[in-house]
Every structure is written in structure tokens, then in C-alpha cells.
């Protein structure tokens, strides 16, 4: 072979190898870029109107030469709210490393480096494309983004902590997807959480919201405690915490009480295990020992293999349909038996129905709950939405060594009016089909105990009863007041405003008394003077007098002696001593009283003195006036009053002026005889004729002396 030919072939082979290397060098970046397109996205959870998105490896350093591009949406007609919880991109020029938001009409960004980035963006659209691109860099966490619709202006990011807020009470909206975001929490749902804990992550731990759904939270900030105990709940591990100045708690719907059930008859299991202790005695791990509050070993299944053909289960009968919002579980609780269930699913049913499996609200798949990680510590899982059923089964999926469970159900009774405790979907787009019998119902089962709206009856009946009671009370009060007013002895209020004295209505009438009335002169401490009166008490009894003002006086039990009006011919039926306007239907005004007198009977002698100085001789008759130097003798056997000053011939003088026939008493028939005897000294003691008792009545205001027989009988 010619040497030149051999050299040409070698050159051709070398050129071919170089061309192949060049092609590989050119195609490698293209292939790498194709593989990494969209591979720069990290944590991503989206729901109907909220979600969370991060760069890859967040909060670690994001990889080189990656691209993350996603489109996020909220319901049409709503505006989109974006909040950047964290943005750390190394590039300063945004040439190869940046974060960009693009909508159909606007562009927001790019953002990178140390640029001032708004914490919140309110977009005029319901859809936006998020693009994150990275080049060659050394450090940088990337970004954390949360979003929600404009229905939730109080949106916060997954990185918000309670220490960021000063208010003692506030409400915020947590987006979906905060459970797996890096960050610690300390505390539990009973004692509260340390104020350095992430708010949304703590809300998931407490069972207030579901991670895949997000939701509204209400926070109460309180004084801190010395130690915070951490537990595992709803897939979130809470750590033990130290003393802090403040802590926070969540307000719940009140349906978080322990549901009681009896160990005998209300708990069943697919099988149970019997062990032998060190002393050779058998230990029965029966279903009745599955209550969390009971001491001793738990329930354990009879088969310890990991390949159970029929599923093992623990069934609880609550006695009636109840709302179940959560479950607490532990393992064997025995240190020498390290048994516990690592994961499980829930089945439930009601009377005469088939068993249903609890499924997730988003993907409509059988929901597997995270169980215990040791035999001792309790773990809590919440059902969002709650289970409404009478029978519940815990079906273990994975376990350690042997299935062993202690269980406590959390929930409340179903009553009319607690419809607010029922979780509702925010949209119909994620409704779950329930046509098949073996599918779960992700909302409470409609029943006679669970109302689907505001129960009008529970509102209307109390209102009607309240109105009836109010009207009944008003009627009773009006009737009582009317009766009291009608039976009042004081007349109407209108009558009391006339500035006149009114006669009080007596509730009863006194009967005539034939007894003697005795009065005493207490003021002058004189010897007892006896004034014997036999008359109708109704004529002498004087009504109480009440003025229209604040002054109230009590009158004497004897009628006043001022009869000027009578002597003047004025009728007592027409008016009193006061010119007071009369109204139709009104009673006669009472006569005015003399100067105030004591409540008991006024002494007769004092009244005589008053009459003697008050009434003139023209009044028609005179009354006797006692002399200071004379006394009535009660021991002499007679009664001889001495003539008073101003008397002509005797103690009594008959009326001189003739009065009309319609006087208050009958006229004497034997006037001439009395007139003849008036000049005789013996006229001091007027004679009493038996025959005149029928034709003559003594004036009401005159005194009738007693005869010797009456005085003797009295003494």
C-alpha cells in the first residue's frame, strides 16, 4: 500500500472522531436543558383558591441552570393575591437568575438579588404564570410564594410567626400547603404554642385547618408558660419548648370533647391476643382494653404476621350517630411489648348501611393517617371534614411487630342548630362522587339530626313565646293596675290636682254604736271630765283629709262644730266651706279641719272651748264653756255643769233664729214650752220628755246631758 494512502485514511478517521465529539458537545447542553426544563420547582400545593410554591431545595441552595414555570389560577371573577414569603436570588442583574410573573396583559418583574420586592402583589387577573430561572451561582435559597383569591385579603405566608403580631386577638387566612414548609413549632393544642412557632403549621398541627385545603384561623395571644410539650399530630411533629414571654392558642368550633363508650359491648375486634407473663399467668389483650384512658395493656390482634389476608380492625359503637372530628391513638403502652400501629385508615357506617372508607377531599382517594412512632406517646389525627356516623372502625395498614391500639375519639353530639360545625366546601369544582356504596362521603351525612341550613323553627318558636309572654305580662300588669286604681280609697290622680281637699272613700262603713265615748284632757292634766254622747257614729265620724300637695292630715273622729254655712242657709249638698269648682260626677268636698289634733279622739271640753271662742251668738245656739275654777263632780251623784262666760241663764241656749224645714235635724214641736222655761234657773238642765223622742232629734252638734240613772250605771 502506498504510504500516502495510509496517511490519508488516518486523517479521515481522526476528522470523523473530531466531528463526533463536536456533535456531542453541541447536543449535550440542549439535552441537559431539555431534561431540566421545569425541574427547578420545589414544594407545590394548589387548591381552588389558594396554594404554596417554592424553588427546588428550599430553604437550601437552589440548583444551577434550572427553570421552574407554573401557571396558577383562582376562580374566574376573582383577583389574584401573591405574597412573597422569601426571595433570595444571587444574581444582581436578573440576566440569568430571576423570578417573573406574567399574565395575559401585564408583566411583574423580573425580581432578583437585593432588589426591593413588594411583599404582596394584587393582580388584575385570575391567572398568572410564574417563571423562575437560575444560572451559575454559589448561594441562594430561591423563593417561597403563597397565593389566594381576593376573597382572602388577610392572606399570610407559611413563614409567619405569632411573634410578628402584637394584637392579642386576630384572624388570618392560611393557604394550602404549609405543612411541609421548613420551620419548627413548639407546644400542643391544649396548652398552646410558643410564640416563635409558625402560625399556619401550628394550625395544621392543632387540627384547625387541613394542609391540602388551607383556611381561616383565629388566634388568641396569652402569657407564656415555662415549658411546652410537643407531640405528633396530623403529620406535624411539635417539639418541646422552653419558657417564653407569650404563647398563642386557636379558637375552635367547640366540637373537640372526648366521646365516651363502654368497653363491654361497644368495642369489638377482628381478633385478640393472649400472652403469658413471667409468672406463667395469661394476659388477655382484649378489645375492652382499647380505651385510651384505661390503665394496663392495650388491645392486640391475634396475628402478628405482616400479611393479613383479611384486614384486622377495631370497631367502636357510639350508641347513636355523632360527629367525630378526630382520633387519638397509642401503642401497647407496655415497655416490654413494643407494639404500635404506624398507619391506618378509617371506615364508618350507620344503622343498616354498608361500610364506607374515609377519603381525601382533594384526590378522592383512601386517606391514610399517620400513626404512632413508639408504643407510648399518643398521636392525634383530625378529620376534616368530620365523620358523622354511629359505628367506626380503625383498620391498621402498617405496624411494628404486632397490631396494638388504644383509642380515644374526639367529637360532639349532633343537635339541631350546630350546623355551623359542619365543614362545607368552598366550591363545587372539587365535589366527590358518592354514587357507589363503598365510596366515602366527605361531608356529613344528611339526617334528621343534622340540619342543612338555619333551622327556622329553633328561631321562630323562642321569638313567638317571648312575644306572647311580653303581651301577657302587659295585660296582667294593666289589669292589676286598673283593679288597684278602682279599689283605691284616694280617688283619681286628676282629682288630686284641683288644690282642694277631697273626701276619702272609706273601704267600709262603721255601724251605729250605742256605747259611751269618754275623752280626757291630757294637756292641762286636769281631773277627768266625762262627756257622754249617745248618737250615730256615722254623723260624728269625720273623714280623713288629704291635700293635693305633699301635706297629709288626719281629721278628728268627731264632726266639726262650725255650722256657719248651715245657719246661712247654704245647702251642704251644693258645696263646702271652700269655693272649689265642682265637676260632674264628683263627690262633695270634705269640710276643712280645725287646727291639727291628735290621732285619738279629741277631748270634748277642748272642742267646747274652741266653739265658744269661734262661733258667734248668731250661729243659732251656744255651747257650754268650762271654767278654770270649777270641776265636774263625779262623786256627788249628780252632774251640774257651771255656766260659762257669756251664757245668759244656763249652759244651753236653744237656737233663736228659725231655720228652713230642710235642716239637718227635725224642729222641736214644743217650742213655746222651751221658751217659757228658758228664763228659769232650772233651765240649766233641760227636761227630757219621753214622748218627744219620736218627734225631735237633737242637733248633731249639741250635747245631751245624762240623767242620774245613766251616771250611776256608768260609775
From Swiss-Prot:
Residues 295-307 have a biased composition (Polar residues). The modification Phosphoserine is found at residue 513. Glycans are attached at residues 64, 124, 277, 351, 418, 455. Residues 248-412 form the F5/8 type C domain. Pfam families: CUB, F5_F8_type_C, LCCL. Keywords: Disulfide bond, Glycoprotein, Membrane, Phosphoprotein, Signal, Transmembrane, Transmembrane helix. Residues 481-715 are cytoplasmic. It is a single-pass type I membrane protein. InterPro entries: CUB_dom, FA58C, Galactose-bd-like_sf, LCCL, LCCL_sf, Neuropilin_MCO_CoagFactor, Sperma_CUB_dom_sf. GO terms for cellular component: plasma membrane. Residues 35-459 are extracellular. Gene3D superfamilies: Galactose-binding domain-like, LCCL-like domain, Spermadhesin, CUB domain. Residues 152-248 form the LCCL domain. This is Discoidin, CUB and LCCL domain-containing protein 1. It comes from Homo sapiens (Human).
